[in-house]
Amino acid sequence: MKIALLGTGNMGKAIANIAKSSGKHELVAELNAATTLSTDAFKDADVIVEVTAPDAFLTNLDLLLQADRPIVVGTTGWYNGIEHVKAKVLEANGSMLYAANFSLGVNIFFRLVHEAARFIAPFEDFDIAVSEQHHTGKIDAPSGTALKVAREILSALPSKTSIKTELPAKGKIQRDELLVSAIRLGSVFGQHSVHIDSSSDSILISHTAKNRQGFAQGAIEAAEWLVRDGGQKGFFSMDDFLNEILSSPEKK
């Protein structure tokens, strides 16, 4: 698979290292924010892997679609405009897969959290909140992964109807609000926790990234899935990829 990598920060470097060491993939372009982009930059690629920044992704969206290549998007922080992006992709008959986090471990974590929220739903005594920690260089807060965790909870727990990303200066958080808090500290790769509490006990579900390798490997595997059979058209999430993998008989 020939990969055009857009974004050469820490995550881009991790993806490049995985691709180069795989023995079966080739990096045909490594582009950063200083690069003047044109569709020619992607002409030799089978797939574009995009890991820049929210503003850069949205600015480059039309050009990426004009390149007529499947696009894997690891950038987060743009999900408020997700319906706009989806409409653009479908209008262009394009191919895009996005994820808040490509790590297999994190995606297992998402499903564990969803089930935990479903289990506590009948019991009014339980409350739930989300916290995350990342390095001080991370741009968006809360992280896209934390917000994905929050959406998993909301989809399974009717008592929570909205996400609150900061506490009010005065007053208290409402029972139907799900608090998602963020800490920026040193060089922490990423830690996400779900806190469940009742008058009798507490439950903590947590995922800690040891490095960026899991994310990078997952992004490559998602790209392989997206380009198979000449390329799949549509707007996909990591759930689409994983659901097909898990339902495939040869994977069981």
From Swiss-Prot:
Positions contributing to NAD(+) binding: E30, G74, T75, T76, A99, A100, N101, F102
EC number per UniProt: 1.17.1.8
Keyword NAD: yes
Keyword annotations from UniProtKB, A to Z: Amino-acid biosynthesis, Cytoplasm, Diaminopimelate biosynthesis, Lysine biosynthesis, NAD, NADP, Oxidoreductase
Catalysed conversion reaction: (S)-2,3,4,5-tetrahydrodipicolinate + NAD(+) + H2O = (2S,4S)-4-hydroxy-2,3,4,5-tetrahydrodipicolinate + NADH + H(+); (S)-2,3,4,5-tetrahydrodipicolinate + NADP(+) + H2O = (2S,4S)-4-hydroxy-2,3,4,5-tetrahydrodipicolinate + NADPH + H(+)
Subcellular location as annotated: Cytoplasm
Any one GO cellular component localisation term in the record: cytosol
One GO term (biological process): diaminopimelate biosynthetic process
Pathway where this protein functions: Amino-acid biosynthesis; L-lysine biosynthesis via DAP pathway; (S)-tetrahydrodipicolinate from L-aspartate: step 4/4
Keyword 4Fe-4S: no
Protein function: Catalyzes the conversion of 4-hydroxy-tetrahydrodipicolinate (HTPA) to tetrahydrodipicolinate.
Family membership: Belongs to the DapB family.
Name this polypeptide is given: 4-hydroxy-tetrahydrodipicolinate reductase
